[in-house]
């Protein structure tokens, strides 16, 4: 199962997103849950870097299964909007594939 741990500060701003695990919905290379979640995450990170002044701290495993993004500037409204959009997309995947992906808010 993919777990997505989301840390939100007292102001409701996303500070950390950690995605761990594997969806195990299909064969390696043919897992639509993994592909969807990965596309949402990587697309969002690329949008933050390409469209805003935010430069988040990023840590990931080259072999897959772990990605951590930490917001450096939680007052960057554009980056926060992209992060919130990412979470809505991941929630949509979770609603359909709740045995393969779980979002946890902290």
UniProtKB/Swiss-Prot annotation:
It holds the Pfam family Peptidase_Prp. It comes from the Bacteria. InterPro entries: Peptidase_Prp (IPR007422), Peptidase_Prp_sf (IPR036764). The keyword Protein biosynthesis does not apply. Gene3D superfamilies: Cysteine protease Prp. Keywords: Hydrolase, Protease, Ribosome biogenesis, Thiol protease. The active site is at 22 (proton donor), 34 (nucleophile). Optimum pH is 7.0. SUPFAM superfamilies: TM1457-like. An essential cysteine protease that cleaves the N-terminal 9 amino acids from ribosomal protein bL27. Also acts as an N-terminal protease on the major capsid and scaffold assembly proteins of bacteriophage 80alpha. Cleavage of the N-terminus of bL27 (and thus this enzyme) is essential for growth; it cannot be replaced by a 'pre-cleaved' or non-cleavable form of bL27. Might serve a chaperone function during ribosome assembly. Homodimer. A mutant protein unable to cleave bL27 copurifies with its substrate. Belongs to the Prp family. This is Ribosomal processing cysteine protease Prp. It comes from Staphylococcus aureus (strain NCTC 8325 / PS 47). The lineage of its organism: Bacteria, Bacillati, Bacillota, Bacilli, Bacillales. The gene is prp.
């Amino acid at each position: 199962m993919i777990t997505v741990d989301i840390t939100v500060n007292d102001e409701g701003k996303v500070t950390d997103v950690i995605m761990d695990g594997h969806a195990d919905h299909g064969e390696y290379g043919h897992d639509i849950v993994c592909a969807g979640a990965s596309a949402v995450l990587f697309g969002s990170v690329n949008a933050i870097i390409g469209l805003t002044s935010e430069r988040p701290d990023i840590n990931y495993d080259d072999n897959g299964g772990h990605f951590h993004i930490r917001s450096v500037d939680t007052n960057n409204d554009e980056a926060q909007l992209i992060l919130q959009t990412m979470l809505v997309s991941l929630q949509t995947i979770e609603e359909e594939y709740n045995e393969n992906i779980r979002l946890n808010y902290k």
